[in-house]
Every structure is written in structure tokens, then in C-alpha cells.
Amino acid sequence: MGDKARARRAMKKAGVPVLPGSEGTLDSEEQALKIAQDIGYPVIIKATAGGGGRGMRVVRNPSEMSRAYRTASREAEAAFGVPDVYVEKYLENPRHIEFQILGDHAGHVVHLGERECSIQRRH
């Protein structure tokens, strides 16, 4: 699930709670502004590909949207080869914990532990 917008849709379909935001990739700055108005600020523009905090920009008010949208999209394309971005509600000071689980076709499953990712390079 390297495409985060597609992963969001899959999680919603599976009943997993997700932050309010766009249903997929954004088509325009205007669409980002409309969604931000609907869900409230602050929001974050995020690259659909990649990770490590690249292609992400926090937007605290409408006057910041145009620059944030363009910068996130350009950075995403430069870093990952894909300019697509989406928007979601921004959480101040969240914790990012990942759990790694592997399974095979025979039903064998192994839990590799958890990882505290809140100290990643950005956001």
C-alpha cells in the first residue's frame, strides 16, 4: 500500500477510523481549500507516495494553502516521481507507532514488534 490516498480508502472501507480529509488525490488547490474549510484548520497536505516527512506541509489558514499545495506537490514529484497529494486534518503533537506483522499463504503470522516513529525527521 505505497499509495497513501488508496490506503486511506481501503481503511475506511474496512471500518478503520481515519482522520477527516480528501477521499483521494487532490485535483486542485481549490479542492484542497474546500475540504479544509469543511473539516477545519489546521490541515496537512501530504504526498501519496514516499515517506519520511517529505512532501508534507501544514496549513493553518486559507492564505497558506496555495504555497503549501504547490510546494508539497513539487517536493513529492522530486522525491518520489509522483506529484499527487491529498489533505487531511492535522493533529498537533501526535504519536506515530508502527506495528509490523508478516503472514504467509499458509496462515502463519509473526509479529515483529512495535516501532516508535514520532521522532522521524519531520512532522
List each model region and its residues.
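N-terminal beta-alpha lobe that positions the nucleotide/phosphoryl donor
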Residues: 1-123
